[in-house]
Amino acid sequence: MIALIQRVSEAAVRVDGEVVGQIDKGLLVLLGVEKDDDEAKAKRLMERVTTYRVFEDSEGKMNLNVQQVDGKVLVVSQFTLPADTKKGTRAGFSRGAHPADAERLYDYFSDLCQQVLPTERGRFAADMKVSLINDGPVTFWLQV
């Protein structure tokens, strides 16, 4: 399971012109689910995402996590993250989970986040338009 996390001052996701998820200060989490992922991996990744220190303390060091700054999380499914890009000019998607499994684990991950801090989400498998103001920019790839 993969999370591409971005520190944002704001982010929103729209489907058919309607805002379905929106946050101010926090993390935009693009979540990719791989074939062998399960609830244990989702829980471990949620723990890493919500405790990963990406926000600056009073000395300007990235020592604070999203919970410590009263931030929020916006989780967006991203089936292209597990893609195989090693050869050629077109990505291969065989490493991604079956859509039903991916949706179940996406929902599970999002629900776990919601138990820890305010969480918004995109709409699984929808054609989404994601807008954000990346603060920094600060972006990390987390994988379990």
Curated annotation (Swiss-Prot):
Motif placement: Gly-cisPro motif, important for rejection of L-amino acids: 136-137
Report a single Gene Ontology molecular function.
Gly-tRNA(Ala) deacylase activity
* Reactions this protein catalyses: glycyl-tRNA(Ala) + H2O = tRNA(Ala) + glycine + H(+); a D-aminoacyl-tRNA + H2O = a tRNA + a D-alpha-amino acid + H(+)
Q: What is its EC number?
A: 3.1.1.96
Keyword Cell division tagged: no
Q: Name one Pfam family in it.
A: Tyr_Deacylase
Q: Which domain of life is it from?
A: Bacteria
Q: Name one GO cellular component term.
A: cytoplasm
Q: Which GO terms describe its biological process?
A: D-amino acid catabolic process
Keyword presence, Hydrolase: yes
Q: Which residues form a coiled coil?
A: none
Q: Which UniProt keywords apply?
A: Cytoplasm, Hydrolase, RNA-binding, tRNA-binding
Its subcellular locations are: Cytoplasm
Which EC class heads this enzyme's classification?
hydrolase
Task: Tell me which InterPro entries the record gives.
Answer: Daa-tRNA_deacyls_DTD, DTD-like_sf
Concerning its family, UniProt says: Belongs to the DTD family.
Stated role:
An aminoacyl-tRNA editing enzyme that deacylates mischarged D-aminoacyl-tRNAs. Also deacylates mischarged glycyl-tRNA(Ala), protecting cells against glycine mischarging by AlaRS. Acts via tRNA-based rather than protein-based catalysis; rejects L-amino acids rather than detecting D-amino acids in the active site. By recycling D-aminoacyl-tRNA to D-amino acids and free tRNA molecules, this enzyme counteracts the toxicity associated with the formation of D-aminoacyl-tRNA entities in vivo and helps enforce protein L-homochirality.
- Could you describe the subunit structure of this protein? Homodimer.
What does its UniProt record remark on the domains?
A Gly-cisPro motif from one monomer fits into the active site of the other monomer to allow specific chiral rejection of L-amino acids.
Protein name per Swiss-Prot or TrEMBL: D-aminoacyl-tRNA deacylase
